[in-house]
Design a protein with these regions (language model features):
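SDR active-site strand-loop-helix element
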Residues: 19-20, 57-62, 106-108
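Substrate-binding strand-loop-helix patch
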Residues: 114-116, 140-149, 168-186, 236
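Mid/C-terminal beta-alpha module of Rossmann-like enzyme folds, strongest
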Residues: 153, 160-204, 245-248
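NAD(P)-cofactor binding segment of oxidoreductase domains
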Residues: 30-58
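Catalytic helix-loop patch of NAD(P)-dependent Rossmann-fold dehydrogenases
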Residues: 30, 37, 41-42, 65-106, ...
Length: 252
């Protein structure tokens, strides 16, 4: 923390993006002390450092601050009601960040794209590529979000000098099962390898909200940014991968 404090005091950045998190929900349930330290205490320390240096914080949060029990998509002013420890600590961190009205909270959901850190899409593609079955929940919904579009929305927040809460998430509320089917179809894999399962059959420790889908219309109104639907978002990833391979062959 001292290194970070010295860096911020030296560079005096206009914006600090806080994306620190343990993203494994079951890990958070089993390691509550570590989770609270990273999500809440570290956020409080970073917020204090940034406020002293007049740096805006953009805090990356989650749809899991909601319980997922309502049928409509959640708006930014809906009251958080997390049902697992990950969501609980992220909701606490949001409150800390928003004590400064200049700061920003970006809630996102099930980020997908090209790379190792986007776990669900990587799991689906790696499995299908090897001819293995993919087991995906048919009763858990998310607003799956294209990674590149999420980054572009952050750029818009900085450009507009926005503040407050924004739901920076994809436009389609989709189950993991349907999402996996779309990935298989767009990438030309066998859709029959996608198998539907219920969260009730799973041995996960942390409770998952059933439908914490996010309404992203504020992004369009305030930031002038529109997220893609799931079909177009997955197609963008496919085109990105194609472009990477074309560049590889041109170089070698």
């Amino acid at each position: 923390m001292l290194v970070l404090k010295n860096l911020i005091e030296k560079e005096k950045p206009d914006v600090v993006i806080n994306a620190m998190a343990y993203s494994n929900l079951d890990f958070c349930e089993d390691h509550k002390k570590d989770t609270f330290l990273l999500h809440v205490e570290m956020t409080e320390k970073i917020s204090s450092i940034c406020e002293n240096n007049v740096s805006k914080i953009i805090f990356i949060s989650t749809d899991y601050v909601f319980d997922g029990k309502q049928n409509e998509k959640y708006n930014e002013d809906d009251e958080p009601n997390p049902i697992n420890y990950y969501g609980h600590t992220k909701a606490l961190a949001e409150k800390i960040v928003l004590k400064n009205p200049n700061n920003v909270v970006l809630r996102t959901s099930l980020v997908y794209g090209y790379g190792k850190r986007v776990r669900f899409m990587k799991y689906v593609l790696d499995s299908l590529k090897n001819g293995n079955e993919v087991f995906a929940y048919n009763d858990i919904f998310n607003s799956a979000t294209n990674l590149d579009e999420f980054v572009e929305s952050i750029e818009k927040v900085i450009e507009k000098n926005a503040n407050g809460i924004f739901h920076t998430s994809g436009s389609t509320c989709v189950t993991r099962y349907d999402f996996a089917k779309i990935i298989a179809r767009k990438f030309g894999f066998d859709e029959s390898l996608i198998k539907s399962i219920s969260i009730k059959e799973s041995k996960v420790k942390a409770k998952r909200p059933v439908k914490p889908c996010l309404n992203n219309s504020k992004c369009s109104k305030i930031l002038g940014y529109n997220f893609s639907n799931i079909e177009l978002g997955v197609l963008k990833v496919l085109n990105e991968i194609k472009n990477v391979w074309l560049l590889f062959w041109e170089l070698f």
